[in-house]
């Protein structure tokens, strides 16, 4: 005996389906099969359309309705698939499939699809077990209590009072979209706290308004609107605002059938809308900006200057103009950057004194009393062979003493007297007189050298 036969006898379940060859349909199944006495009565567990709605479409559902209480014996392809005992509970005609060796591809697909869906719902097994397993759970969900290590499945909670519309609503809840729900022409039931629905705990929880498009309205807003309208409702209320459908119930457990709908009156919606004029706060009028205060008088106040004598027409004291700065950044500027003097004559040292226009009278009086204006320094340029050697170097001699004026006056008078007496009596001795005058003039030049230097001090070659 093969391993599959041993496993079949151990589990005591009839092997009703054969092996498929390369995915072929049920018509090409092998002829070898195992059969034994069965412990359970019915192959199919009261398959109702309500149960099959979760996994089958409408066409398959119509096809499988007669299978609810089908017979145990059904001839297929000339082989017996049923159990040995006759059916006692069957009241509907059995499912008959005409035997044919070559089924069309469309018919084969229908047969295989139907049996696959029955296998998903736990009606029959696809293949026999390969090895005997004693303590493992049953491979056949429909196995009886005598099966080792397995427990029967609880019956499905199907109520006869439940209408097909409620079931379709639940199926539609899992399959349809929000757009299809909004297009339905149905009235929404009002939310009830006192009457609990089936499998729901209404009244035990709170409503989460975050799932709704319409905002939550407090009791204060409701009382405010009723007082404002004077207790008179709006004669022409607009249609209620459609809110989006909830995916999960906010008051009951997940998957409750009755979805509550909350309706808020138009006045409440209008009150809570952000675009309404009543919701906007009243803005007080702007306070006029006061004019800028007059700028206080920050001028200097003293006993000598009063407000009457001080006027805006008075001008500040004069400031001496600045001399143009040299473009060079060196600390010792070149002579070319120095100011040029008129006629090439360098002014005396007193020219560096402050300008009398911007100097107080007391300073000028002090300079005049000291005699600084009459004193002139003696500057002698360096001359070689009748030419000035340098324009930057010179001899600075001390001030000319006053007694030299007497010597200069004496030598001038002596020249005039001696020169006129020698030239007149002896006109023929011009050569001798000229020879004698030359040493005399030379001595006069030596004696009056300091006098001549005074005149040379003012001549400076450019």
UniProtKB/Swiss-Prot annotation:
The modification Phosphothreonine is found at residues 127, 131. One of its GO terms (cellular component) is cytosol. GO terms for molecular function: GTPase activator activity; protein kinase binding; SH3 domain binding; small GTPase binding. Residues 284-293 have a biased composition (Pro residues). Pfam families: GTPase_binding, Inhibitor_Mig-6. It is found in: Cytoplasm; Cell membrane; Nucleus. Residues 334-363 are annotated as: Interaction with EGFR and ERBB2 and regulation of EGFR activation. The keyword Protein biosynthesis does not apply. Residues 312-321, 437-448 have a biased composition (Basic and acidic residues). InterPro entries: Cdc42-bd-like, EGFR_SigReg_Kinase, Mig-6. Residues 225-374, 415-448 are annotated as: Disordered. Keywords: Acetylation, Cell membrane, Cytoplasm, Membrane, Nucleus, Phosphoprotein, Tumor suppressor. The keyword Cytoplasm applies. The modification Phosphoserine is found at residues 251, 273, 302, 461. Changing residue 352 to A: Abolishes inhibition of EGFR activity. Residues 326-337, 362-372 have a biased composition (Polar residues). The modification N-acetylserine is found at residue 2. It is a peripheral membrane protein. Induction: Levels are very low in quiescent cells. Up-regulated by mitogens. GO terms for biological process: apoptotic process; bile acid biosynthetic process; cartilage development; cell migration; cellular hyperosmotic response; cellular response to dexamethasone stimulus; cellular response to epidermal growth factor stimulus; cellular response to insulin stimulus. Belongs to the MIG6 family. Negative regulator of EGFR signaling in skin morphogenesis. Acts as a negative regulator for several EGFR family members, including ERBB2, ERBB3 and ERBB4. Inhibits EGFR catalytic activity by interfering with its dimerization. Inhibits autophosphorylation of EGFR, ERBB2 and ERBB4. Important for normal keratinocyte proliferation and differentiation. Plays a role in modulating the response to steroid hormones in the uterus. Required for normal response to progesterone in the uterus and for fertility. Mediates epithelial estrogen responses in the uterus by regulating ESR1 levels and activation. The EGFR-binding region prevents binding of a cyclin-like activator to the EGFR kinase domain, and thereby keeps EGFR in an inactive conformation. Also maintains EGFR in an inactive conformation by preventing formation of an asymmetric homodimer. Interacts with ERBB2. Interacts with EGFR. This is ERBB receptor feedback inhibitor 1. It comes from Homo sapiens (Human). The lineage of its organism: Eukaryota, Metazoa, Chordata, Craniata, Vertebrata. The gene is ERRFI1.
